[in-house]
């Protein structure tokens, strides 16, 4: 089998001066790029130059870039500051909500706080205390078991803090939970994707949710209808209030002026109802603004018109009530799919009726590999439990020595990978609990978490070594993965060629092993207590309603001898 290119440069015989020249060139290009970014930042927000000296660019994400800077204090010494530059296209309400999360919940209990904030036009820079930290991947296999306990304990302290304020972080992962191993300091950072619970104490998060709901409604304003002529687009039906609201253009109608005689509300509403063409209906009563009829003819026609309009109003009210009832029935059908369903429910096909429905809108923000089952299945009611699932995935990586543990290209593949560990039947039952129907072509049994983690960490000498990937990268037990979706198998095989694999070597048989200079710390790993896997099981509970909370996790027996 052809050897991955990531490992071809590890052998001394293959090295040549061109490799070193290429590395130097890439390094110079990177440094020049960082220098250019710093110059552009100082130009965009010139007041930064008066306060900070920007040293380096230490991070970059989809919505922001982070720089290391120093501030000259009055006492004479320098203080390191992390400057987070938000992309100019960020919504002002989203920026304000992130700032409020940092000021209200931050600054204690391992949650990053806020020092300053600068703005120039559409550029916003948040200044926060700088915490020097290690890369999670670099220290993963050198952490002692006690360090893992401390890491998880402090993560739950931070999550308990933000959950008390009704903040759902949505992006809990190792790179957002900074860890200084030497100082034993921790910090939960990046509230750019944060959302509020229904009773959140962060007022601006309520507005962020309402803004998101309005955007979702506007995206669903036009939905497809499948018929014999193909896919058509039509506007969503108006609500009852919208249908009953008089339009200002009606006031220009002569018909209204002609009918309107008194000041009572009834005749006014009759007059408004005459000009029905405003609501998209044909009107056969439009006539010239100059009338040549006698008063008697006018009176007779008026009485007839009033009778006709009264009947129309009664019909309209019936139609409105019918539409309202249909709307309620649609909502009921959506919430109770087992009662009101179509022919394709519970099968592996999708009918034209389902294809014509609006796409279900639900928050999906987060990092692939750390998103909970309810996020992957677009459950609209998402709570702080999604953060606890992400914490469980981190704990799974720490216990197994594999990172990232899950790595999928799409939501269905990610769900299939979760089934590989937690079981297909259990996943289906949990999905049913929060109103989702999940189908799996083959039944995949749930794995024993202790056996899985020990096998992946290499503590079980009776289990053959895995050829799928090195320690530090996600891999699955071949016996379990053979029952999964072919997408999951394809993703699993691709992980062996990840760039991070260059930290490990492969022997002649094709198996991965630690390099000799790897400082693996085996302290405590030979006797991991059952409480660790019990906590892991509760964190990876597929049902968000019964998943353990951060407050309950801190009281778990796994942390019984740690101070609160």
UniProtKB/Swiss-Prot annotation:
Domain Protein kinase: 52-564
Protein's cellular compartments: Nucleus
Top EC class of this enzyme: transferase
SUPFAM superfamilies for the chain: Protein kinase-like (PK-like)
Ranges for region Disordered: 460-506
Residue sites binding ATP per the record: 58-66, 84
Gene3D superfamilies per record: Phosphorylase Kinase, domain 1, Transferase(Phosphotransferase) domain 1
Quaternary structure (record): Forms a complex with either DBF4/DBF4A or DBF4B, leading to the activation of the kinase activity. Interacts with CLASPIN (via the acidic patch); the interaction is required for phosphorylation of MCM proteins and CLASPIN.
Family under the similarity heading: Belongs to the protein kinase superfamily. Ser/Thr protein kinase family. CDC7 subfamily.
Name listed for the protein in its UniProt record: Cell division cycle 7-related protein kinase
């Amino acid at each position: 089998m052809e050897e991955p290119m990531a490992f071809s440069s590890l052998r001394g015989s293959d090295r040549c001066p061109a490799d070193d020249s290429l590395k130097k060139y890439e390094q110079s290009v990177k440094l020049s790029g960082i220098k250019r970014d710093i110059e552009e930042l100082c130009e965009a927000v010139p007041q930064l130059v008066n306060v900070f000296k920007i040293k380096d660019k230490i991070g970059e994400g989809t919505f922001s870039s982070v720089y290391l800077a120093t501030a000259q204090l009055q006492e004479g010494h320098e203080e390191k500051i992390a400057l987070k530059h938000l992309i100019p296209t960020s919504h002002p309400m989203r920026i304000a909500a992130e700032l409020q999360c940092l000021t209200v919940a931050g600054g204690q209990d391992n949650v990053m706080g806020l020092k300053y904030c600068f703005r120039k036009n559409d550029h916003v820079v948040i200044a926060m205390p700088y915490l020097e930290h290690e890369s999670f991947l670099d220290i993963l296999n050198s952490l002692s078991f006690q360090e893992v306990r401390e890491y998880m304990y402090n993560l739950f302290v931070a999550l308990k803090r933000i959950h008390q304020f009704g903040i759902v972080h949505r992006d809990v992962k190792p790179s957002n939970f900074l860890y200084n191993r030497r100082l034993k300091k921790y910090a939960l950072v990046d509230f750019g994707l944060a959302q509020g619970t229904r009773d959140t104490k962060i007022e601006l998060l309520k507005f962020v949710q309402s803004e998101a709901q309005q955007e979702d409604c506007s995206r669903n304003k036009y939905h497809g209808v499948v018929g014999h002529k193909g896919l058509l687009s039509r506007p969503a039906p108006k609500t009852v209030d919208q249908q009953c609201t008089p339009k200002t253009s009606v006031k220009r109608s002569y018909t209204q002026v002609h009918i309107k005689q008194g000041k009572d509300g009834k005749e006014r509403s009759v007059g408004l109802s005459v000009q029905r063409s405003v609501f998209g209906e044909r009107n056969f009563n439009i006539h010239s603004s100059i009338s040549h009829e006698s008063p008697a003819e006018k009176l007779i026609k008026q009485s007839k018109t009033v009778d006709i309009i009264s009947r129309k109003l009664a019909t309209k009210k019936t139609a409105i009530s019918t539409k309202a009832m249909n709307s309620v029935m649609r909502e009921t059908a959506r919430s109770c799919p087992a009662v009101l369903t179509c022919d394709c429910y519970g099968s592996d096909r999708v009918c034209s009726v389902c294809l014509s429905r609006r796409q279900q809108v639900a928050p999906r923000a987060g990092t692939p590999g750390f998103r909970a089952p309810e996020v992957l299945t677009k459950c609209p009611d998402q709570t702080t439990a999604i953060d606890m699932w992400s914490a469980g995935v981190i704990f799974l990586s720490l216990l197994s020595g594999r990172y990232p543990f899950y790595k999928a290209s799409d939501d269905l593949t990610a769900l299939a990978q979760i089934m590989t560990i937690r079981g297909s039947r259990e996943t289906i039952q949990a999905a049913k609990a929060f109103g989702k129907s999940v189908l799996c072509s083959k039944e995949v049994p749930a794995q024993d978490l202790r056996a899985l983690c020990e096998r992946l960490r290499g503590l079980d000498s009776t289990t053959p070594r895995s050829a799928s990937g090195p320690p530090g990268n996600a891999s699955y037990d071949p016996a379990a993965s053979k029952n999964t979706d072919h997408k999951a198998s394809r993703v699993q095989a691709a992980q062996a060629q990840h760039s991070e694999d260059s930290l490990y070597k492969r022997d002649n048989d094709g198996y991965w092993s630690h390099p000799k200079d790897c400082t693996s710390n085996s302290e405590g790993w030979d006797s991991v207590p059952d409480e660790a896997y019990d906590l892991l099981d509760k964190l990876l509970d597929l049902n968000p309603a019964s998943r353990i909370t951060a407050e309950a996790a801190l009281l778990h027996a796994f942390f019984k001898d740690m101070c609160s």
